[in-house]
């Protein structure tokens, strides 16, 4: 969907070359943390949370910070995040995700059903990507 790339609360969208000439509309929205959402909706979360998928166009790390209590309590087996060009302007990288998610191994989801590639997030070359999805798998 061509509009989904514009669906972001990132403040630096105009710095991204191919978005520079796009019409960007601003809309006020209400946001909340995952921790608050889980707390307000306890009936929905009686069972253990095993999987969290985050795709917030450049704000995934902030979402993780807002899910810290939920992650600590439920220790999901998998947490999936998306890394894309928005991170060039937010100053965030894969290493910061891995540092926050201690006790998890990092895997890049390879395109075209080519499986998972284990990644060492401390290596600089593993923090350079265009569009990638990563799975953080809880260590045993």
Describe the function of each predicted region.
Residues 37-140:
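Conserved acidic-Pro-Pro-aromatic motif
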Residues 1-37, 41-44, 132:
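Glycine-rich adenosyl-binding loop in Rossmann-like folds that engage adenosine-containing cofactors
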């Amino acid at each position: 969907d061509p509009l989904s790339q514009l669906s972001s609360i990132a403040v630096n969208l105009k710095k991204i070359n191919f978005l520079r000439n796009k019409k960007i509309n601003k809309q006020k929205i209400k946001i909340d943390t995952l921790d608050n959402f889980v707390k307000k909706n306890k009936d929905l979360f009686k069972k253990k949370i095993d999987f969290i998928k985050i795709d917030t166009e450049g704000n995934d790390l902030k979402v993780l910070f807002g899910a810290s209590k939920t992650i600590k309590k439920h220790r999901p087996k998998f947490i999936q995040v998306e890394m894309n060009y928005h991170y060039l302007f937010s100053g965030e990288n894969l290493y910061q995700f891995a540092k926050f998610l201690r006790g998890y191994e990092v895997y890049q989801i390879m395109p075209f059903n080519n499986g998972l590639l284990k990644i060492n997030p401390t290596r600089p070359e593993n923090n350079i990507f265009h569009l990638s999805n990563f799975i953080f798998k809880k260590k045993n």
